[in-house]
A protein has these predicted regions:
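Rossmann-fold cofactor-recognition segment
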Residues: 43-61
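NAD(P)-cofactor binding segment of oxidoreductase domains
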Residues: 62-68, 94-118
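Catalytic loop of short-chain dehydrogenase/reductase
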Residues: 119-156, 160-196
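Short-chain dehydrogenase/reductase
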Residues: 7, 98-106, 135-153, 225-227
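Conserved mid-core segment of classical short-chain dehydrogenase/reductases
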Residues: 81-98
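C-terminal helical subdomain
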Residues: 159-161, 180-265
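N-terminal Rossmann NAD(P)H-binding glycine-rich loop of SDR-like oxidoreductase domains
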Residues: 5-26
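Conserved NAD(P)H cofactor-binding loop of Rossmann-fold oxidoreductase domains
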Residues: 76-86, 124-125
Length: 268
């Protein structure tokens, strides 16, 4: 019997991981899924055998997790994140980066130390494309930390990362909302690429043009775009089938492996 841990089990990536586990592994697999937000008594995450509500930074939440199978898990999927977005990555302050890392990165090595996990899967994006460099803010630094961690395994626990193209998520919606608000005064948009989408254009139309710009850049760089839930699930299945994968990239229908992290110093 294999135990699987999903942190952030209600999000797009978390639900994709759960679906992929159910499809790939046998029915005796046990999934423990964690979520945090506005508490809903009795809520159970679909596809999970046990649901744990709580902030992963709280000791009581981690102790609950450890109570399952003595803290021994075949896989952990770390699918939660929170950080300041809507500003250029290069403009994020250290305070903003630290705040983003608190949930988006720091718990990963902490859980690696506290639990007995065979493989940890984290998540990233193509944050070095021009559109992401101009809007991904502090989250870009947290994702870089994840990518550096992915290639730094000491062999005790396997590290893997699914790097995905733009898909609809709380983070992408947050960026669009912040851009809509910021664009009301064009002086707030210092980045010339961003500014070009909103000049002499209603903010709602500017957001659409911005999103189309991301899709166009992704397609030019990686061969496809418009990543959806099915694509994300297929990326997980590809990871399960691979022999010691490092990065599994997914952009639209295209999925491919790679070994090198994206380093911001080459772009900012």
């Amino acid at each position: 019997m294999k135990f699987f841990l999903v942190i952030g089990g209600t999000g797009v990536m978390g639900t994709s991981a759960i679906r992929a586990i159910r499809e790939h592994f046998d029915q005796n697999s046990v999934i423990i899924a964690n979520w945090y937000g506005k508490e809903s008594p009795g809520f159970q995450i679909e596809g999970a055998d046990n649901t744990i509500f709580g902030d992963i930074n709280d000791l009581s939440c981690r102790e609950q997790i450890k109570s399952f199978n003595n803290g021994i898990f075949e896989y952990m999927f770390y699918a939660t994140a929170l950080g300041d977005v809507g500003i250029p990555i290069k403009d994020a302050t250290q305070e903003q980066i630290d705040r983003s890392n608190k949930l988006s990165f720091n718990p990963i090595p902490q859980l690696e130390n506290e639990l007995d996990i065979t493989t940890i899967v984290a998540y990233s994006t193509f944050y070095t494309i021009r559109h992401q460099l101009s809007t991904y803010g502090a989250m870009g630094h947290s994702k870089e930390n994840i990518e550096k961690w992915t290639v730094a395994s000491d062999g005790t626990t396997n590290h893997a990362c699914i790097r995905a193209g733009l898909f609809e998520s709380p983070s992408s919606r947050g960026i669009k909302l912040l851009l809509r608000k910021t664009s009301k005064n064009l002086d707030n948009l210092k980045d010339p690429l961003l500014r070009s989408y909103f000049e002499n254009t209603p903010s709602s139309e500017g957001i659409k043009k911005f999103e189309e710009g991301i899709f166009k850049e992704e397609k030019e760089a990686y061969g496809d775009c418009r990543t959806d839930k099915e694509d994300l699930m297929r990326a997980h299945l590809e990871l399960f089938k691979s022999d010691n994968p490092i990065f599994v990239n997914v952009c639209g229908k295209k999925i491919w492996p790679s070994k090198e992290p994206l380093l911001l110093k080459q772009f900012i």
